[in-house]
Amino acid sequence: MEGKARITPQGEAAGTATTASVPGTTTDGMDPGVVATTSVVTTENASTSVATAGIGGPPQQVDQQETWRTNFYYNDVFTWSVADAPGSILYTVQHSPQNNPFTAVLSQMYAGWAGGMQFRFIVAGSGVFGGRLVAAVIPPGIEIGPGLEVRQFPHVVIDARSLEPVTITMPDLRPNMYHPTGDPGLVPTLVLSVYNNLINPFGGSTSAIQVTVETRPSEDFEFVMIRAPSSKTVDSVTPAGLLTTPVLTGVGTDNRWNCQIVGLQPVPGGLSTCNRHWNLNGSTYGWSSPRFTDIDHRRGASQPGGNNVLQFWYANAGSAVDNPICQVAPDGFPDMSFVPLNGPNVPTAGWVGFGAIWNSNSGAPNVTTVQAYELGFATGAPNNLQPATNTSGSQIVAKSIYAVSTGANQNPAGLFVMASGVISTPTARAITYTPQPDRIVNAPGTPAAAPVGKNVPIMFASVVRRTGDVNAEAGSDNGTQYGTGSQPLPVTIGLSLNNYSSALTPGQFFVWQLNFASGFMEIGLNVDGYFYAGTGASTTLIDLTELIDIRPVGPRPSTSTLVFNLGGATSGFSYV
């Protein structure tokens, strides 16, 4: 288009001024043709900029390249152990602005993003260890798992002996111009696997080192379409905040007993549970909401039988029809199995739980009392209590059975409902415990948690009361018993309120690192809501007394062995 050429005013040096249409200048609110000063480095302002580091300089006299684009910043850390075999995947991360602390914050202001990300790896081996890792960029759509030869993709090799950081760029492979901030869609994945075993040539007790991950955006990284401050997009949630330090250090309870969590119980044989257990889709196969309320109310019914006198209390938990979650059983109905007993052979360490109900004698626990207080599926009138073997046919009635021997020389008889996760021990001072997850009542279709290599399911152990033990704790007169739950209750509540399905895929763990005074370990959460630890065949309960803090690590393939590097963290209790 023809038009009049703009005449440069006299005295205006070339390059020191430009029209507002030039990219990189401030144009908002300017009329066409308004002159805007650009960043021009002269001998006068260059020395000033260096001396003041560009702080407080006049507008647009500071270098436009912000430090968050030029500097590497800490993003993550993972552990490399001598036990990791060649091919073991130690670290994976999908391309996202969340991989850098500054782009993660800025992404909240924009509707989309595009561009690559640079990753820098620093091995904390001080040049002593031998071994190599390979970092590879895997294109979108390729499944990451055992057998994947990552060296067939663009990669770099990281030598443990090298003291220099190693950098690799993750390009942005995308079918569209930009990624939406909430759902990035198909993106590449960065994978680090073992090339050669880690070797400590001097031996000793050190068997692992840490690799620090730092990031910065590539030169082509950019955001697009700023959002209004009042607007809000649908962002994919992350499970990182589900498991925190307070949950496992005092305020957290388990989802079966609602008692304070004191340890982690590995279950190498696997387990399956559904009641108050929720998955990452925000759904459950169970029948109870993640809340505990008083469900025992005395009805005062007595059932005489010769010299035996039993008193029964029945649960007042509503009916299955009134349960909005599931009509298998009333909300809050436990997943306990039955132990029917008739005659005098009643366990002398019968169970007391869910509110610590005991038979008192002048205000103190009656040591001659034999009692069992749990709930189970039962049918029939109070005079003819029978356990229900299935949930079809006759109506399921929730019964809280609390049998009490009202005479010192009398033998109680009747249906005792014992906890499946706890064994009633023969002596009052026994402090042994064996989990029995195979006796937990489950609904049809409930997924099971099976071991994945050395990664085995874990349950969260809590101290619960025993018969006549008012203040049950470690070392109490009646010993210590432990109940186990599949999740901390705060995690159960979080899963029930949100949908984390976009954050994790089948075959992945979301991993947290637990730091102890004597070492560290990792635990992972899968899509079914089960937690795992890399404890192998060990059944030793892990005491959480020395736990210092918990740090989220991120997604990782479930085939990658979770790090277990603890020493002396299981002292203080006796277990079997």
Swiss-Prot record:
Keywords linked to the UniProt accession: Capsid protein, Host cytoplasm, T=3 icosahedral capsid protein, Virion
One Pfam family in the UniProt entry: Calici_coat
Post-translational modification: The N-terminus is blocked.
Domain of life (superkingdom): Viruses
Segments for region (Disordered): 1-31
Localization, UniProt: Virion; Host cytoplasm
Compositional bias ranges of the Low complexity kind: 13-29
Note: Two different RNAs lead the expression of the capsid protein. One arises from the cleavage of the polyprotein translated from the genomic RNA and the other from the translation of a subgenomic RNA derived from the (-)RNA template. Capsid protein expressed from the subgenomic mRNA is produced in much larger amounts than the cleaved one.
Record-stated family: Belongs to the caliciviridae capsid protein family.
Record text on subunit structure and interactions: Homodimerizes, then multimerizes. Binds to histo-blood group antigens at surface of target cells.
Protein name: Subgenomic capsid protein VP60
